[in-house]
Amino acid sequence: MHDNPRILEIAILDELPMSLVTEAIDFFNYNYPNDSKKQMNLGFFSSKLDHANPNGRGYFTVAIYDGKVVGTCTAVRKTLISGTNLIKAVEIGDTYTSKNFRKSCQFSQLYPGTSSADEYLNKSIFGRLATETLDRARADGVEYVYGTPNLQAKLSWLGRLNFKLVDGNFTYRISSASITHSFYASSRTLKAFGLVYTKITYLLCKFATNKYSMSLVSKHDLHQFPEPKIEATRKDCIQLLNSRSWIQARFVNNTAKEYKIVKIEKRANSQLCGYLFFLEHTRADDFKLLILSKSLFFDKQIERLIIPVSKIAADKFFKYENLSIWVDKRKNSIKYRALFGFLSKDFRVDIVGKSLKGEVGELELKNFYNFQYGDSDLA
């Protein structure tokens, strides 16, 4: 640390105290005029953080030196949809630090659980602001931050801040008031219209959404998967082994991610018939449908529905629950169709090859897809 570090204070602006918000706006306009000239005003912060956002009140934290704002961080409440599950999330944004305060700084109060002023959260403005902001979100039941980290901040999020990266396809509710804030902030009449509009889109969110592939970070520890208990008398049913049989695998089209794999054996003779894959960060109540080579394994929220091996041992078409499945060994692929009432969607997996050695597996897959099956997805 510098011999005479500048001492910073943390201020929480969730209730939007006028004086400090004005200081924050001045900070943006002075330090980042190109980024803030059209948006950084009181209406911008109000639409993100107060009750105008139907997803919930947001979070706003600033760092202060000598009465002036020198760093900011906001977290805007969002609602994501994954299958039939509503996920509480926040979008981190407006995380700016004065260029003159990125070194030789120290916070007046140690972060809870730390013991030294030289620890990261007691001297990094970015780390302290992000952590203080997300601590309050987490206390309100928020589990995820989406749209973060970008490439520049990724190492800090996943390294120093100890978050975990989770990939997935989520549906984003467009009901956030921030979409209309620039329109209705100019007058009370337009603001009232904007609030009505966001309430309507909130009710119709499932009909007015956009699809995004986004990165999520969660500081929560991974849930432990329960030991599966399968009662089966048919000899051609397959059995899940316990967690001691898990091994690690990597996919060549996504080498940065690790997946867990459970070995599947026939109950009658312990013959190996396939592997069940799931993301390392998948929750126990959020299983996915996964396909590999000749084997299809099917999990529906904790209740385990397993397709008998005999049904997928040869080239043929068959139906299982609301899935229509084609197995084509000649093309070394599986194609399946998920039915949504009158709608359907086709998925295909092309297998390039596989090599499993001992307790470490390496797979080569091309166009690997998965599809989440919830209680009402295929009703």
Predicted regions and their residues:
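Active-site/acyl-donor-binding loops of N-acyltransferases
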Residues: 2-5, 43, 143-199, 250-253, ...
